[in-house]
């Protein structure tokens, strides 16, 4: 399953390369890295030069997120959240509990050309919704979410 926002610029040949590398490294959840001038909320999602892909402890909810079929029974359907803030740190905890490798594909960086964050909605309301959603649920703390487990420079 591939979830794509409406404000993302994908490079030529993106889909085949992205899915090939996500599959090659066995990522259960994957996202493309952000280009240098792309809006990225998390430093770990920024492109790393000379790296094809990285196994990380976190995959962001957007602007592009891929889910392997094996995750569907656990992660779908998505909860009824307005903005979805906090869902990705919860997914990261679930992935860790299940031993699922997750990661960022650096070889196909995208540009998230979004409007300024929270321009179309209340940032305070989104934060309150995230806090409410995460209360009583497992989630990966920010410091852990920023960690890279392994960097892959070749696909073989």
Predicted regions mapped to residue ranges:
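Short beta-strand-to-loop acidic/aromatic patch adjacent to the donor-nucleotide binding site
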Residues: 1-9
């Amino acid at each position: 399953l591939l979830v794509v926002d409406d404000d993302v610029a994908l490079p030529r040949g993106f889909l085949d390369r992205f899915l090939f590398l996500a599959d090659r490294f066995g990522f259960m959840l994957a996202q493309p890295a952000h280009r240098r001038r792309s809006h990225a909320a998390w430093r770990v999602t920024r492109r790393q030069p000379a790296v094809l892909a990285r196994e990380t402890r976190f995959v962001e909810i957007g602007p592009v997120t891929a889910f392997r079929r094996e995750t569907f029974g656990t992660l779908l359907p998505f909860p009824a959240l307005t903005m979805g803030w906090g869902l990705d740190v919860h997914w990261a905890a679930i992935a860790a509990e299940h031993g699922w490798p997750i990661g960022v594909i650096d070889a196909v960086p995208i540009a998230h050309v979004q409007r300024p964050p929270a321009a179309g909605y209340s940032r305070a309301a989104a934060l309150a919704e995230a806090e409410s959603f995460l209360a009583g649920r497992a989630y990966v703390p920010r410091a852990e979410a920023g960690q890279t487990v392994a960097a892959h420079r070749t696909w073989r």
